Regions:
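Non-catalytic, solvent-exposed segments at the cell envelope interface
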Residues: 2-340
Length: 340
């Protein structure tokens, strides 16, 4: 079964690129948003402390504050990048997730999309999905990268996106350390001899990291290593570990011991978050996140057999979707309206 791709024409230049791009890929009836912004200091403290800027638990939201997607369902795009000391945001996305909530049933879920999944990027043809943020940023629009990613997901998966949150993973370390570390139940031994460890004298240096099974306390550096390592297992296992780490961050952030740490968390957040959500929407998310029962959140990774490995003519290794297998998963997570 092949999904029909709805591909808009290439974006034009100018300040309205983001709205034009999203409007072309969005189905009738979905709302529009303004450009990216940073949370104010006081609000960032609340948002970060509740884990909202980091994970797919951005799901229990007052429905009146967010536009409707599929039959009132709310879908948020969650992105992680590694700026490696840079100041811009035009980098390939290292983590791509879609968080979803049905406000009527309170059913929630997180979909992890592999960064090497090849899809049609509106206006740019077939390429890995993690390149969309770079292509969109080439339009001289700071909000263009996430806009193109949203359009790509909408065009290929038929999932309307209501907003995005993007975080720099280097600040992720600081956030975990500010929380005093997190507890992770490591299920499988992990040994990676080629974990990237760039240095000024050798930007391509590696180091060895190792995790034994069992409950472990991790600081920011260890948590990031555990979430991002891919050489000893697979990119799909990596996506599952990322979801576990994000759940652990939320658990710690919601603890009473985290309350005195909120001001410092806010300071870390100011330079590490981009979002197109309005201030009142962020506040609604923060106030509602604590009510979510994390044990009931569906966690899905697009992995084999939902996708299969392929080598392109240029030698690049990518993953290709099996829509006949993916569609039932999307229906279960997002509702029947996503399959047309």
């Amino acid at each position: 079964m092949t999904r029909e791709l709805r591909v808009p024409p290439p974006p034009s230049s100018g300040a309205t690129d983001r709205q034009q791009l999203r409007n072309q890929a969005r189905r009738a009836g979905a709302h529009q948003r303004t450009g990216a912004r940073r949370p104010t200091l006081w609000l960032a403290a609340l948002v970060v402390a509740l884990g909202i800027v980091l994970c797919g638990l951005l799901l229990v939201v007052a429905p009146s504050l967010l536009g409707t997607g599929i039959d009132g369902r709310i879908n948020l795009l969650l992105l992680g990048i590694d700026r490696r000391g840079g100041t811009g945001w035009a980098y390939r996305t290292d983590t791509i997730m879609v968080a979803t909530l049905d406000p009527d049933t309170q059913e929630a879920g997180i979909l992890s999309i592999p960064r090497d999944l090849q899809l049609t990027i509106p206006g740019y043809g077939q390429d890995r999905i993690n390149t969309a943020n770079v292509y969109g940023s080439l339009q001289d629009n700071p909000d263009g990268g996430p806009a193109l990613l949203e359009a790509t997901i909408e065009a290929n998966f038929a999932i309307p996106i209501d907003g995005y949150l993007m975080i720099d993973f280097r600040s992720f370390e600081q956030i975990v350390d500010t929380l005093g570390g997190i507890e992770i139940e490591v299920s499988t031994r992990l040994h990676d001899t080629r974990y990237p460890d760039p240095k000024p004298e050798d930007p391509f240096a590696y180091k060895t990291i190792h995790f034994e099974p069992g409950l472990q306390h991790m600081d920011g550096s260890k948590a990031l290593e555990y979430a991002r390592s891919r050489m000893s297992t697979s990119d799909f296992d990596r996506a599952k570990r990322q979801q576990l780490v994000l759940l652990a961050i939320r658990e710690k952030a919601l603890s009473l011991s985290a309350i005195p740490r909120w001001p410092k968390l806010a300071a870390v957040a100011i330079d590490s978050i981009r979002t197109d959500l309005e201030t009142h929407e962020l506040l609604a998310l923060a106030l509602s996140a604590a009510r979510l029962d994390a044990s009931k959140v569906k966690q899905v990774v697009l992995e084999h057999p939902l996708v299969f490995s392929h080598r392109r003519a240029d030698g690049a290794a990518v993953q290709l979707p099996r829509w006949d297998l993916i569609n039932p998963v999307l229906v279960d997570l997002f509702g029947p309206q996503v399959v047309q």
